C-alpha cells in the first residue's frame, strides 16, 4: 500500500489546524473518491500522480503542485509504472473522519 509518514498533524504532534505528510504511492495504487472537509496541497517530488477533480483528470508530475479545495469530489491514484513520491499538506489537519471516502475499502 501507500507509505504515509506524518510529520505534523493529529497523530504525530496532536496539531489539528494543519497536517504535513510525506507519501510514496506504489505503481497501480488508488483510493476511493472522497469529499474532504480540508484543503489539500500536493507537492510532487518524483513520479506522477493522477487526480480526478469533479470528473476532470489531472496528471501531476515531479516539481508540480496542486491545491484541491475542501468540499470538492476528488480521487487520487497512481496508474503509472513508477512510484509517486509527494508531500501532502492539509488545512485543517487530515483525519479519517473528515476525508469522507465514498467507499472505504482501501487503507
Residue ranges and their predicted role:
Residues 48-50, 57, 73, 83:
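Structural motif
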Residues 17-18, 35-36, 79-80:
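Short glycine/proline-enriched turns and hinge-like loops at secondary-structure junctions
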Residues 22-26, 34-51, 89-91:
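Short, conserved beta-strand element in jelly-roll/cupin
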Residues 55-70:
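Short acidic-glycine-tyrosine-enriched beta hairpin
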Residues 1-17, 24, 32, 98-107:
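A short, N-terminal "cap"/entry segment at the start of jelly-roll beta-barrel domains
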Residues 14, 70-96:
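Ligand-binding loop in jelly-roll beta-barrel domains
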Residues 30-31, 50, 66, 70-76:
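Histidine-centered metal-chelating micro-motifs
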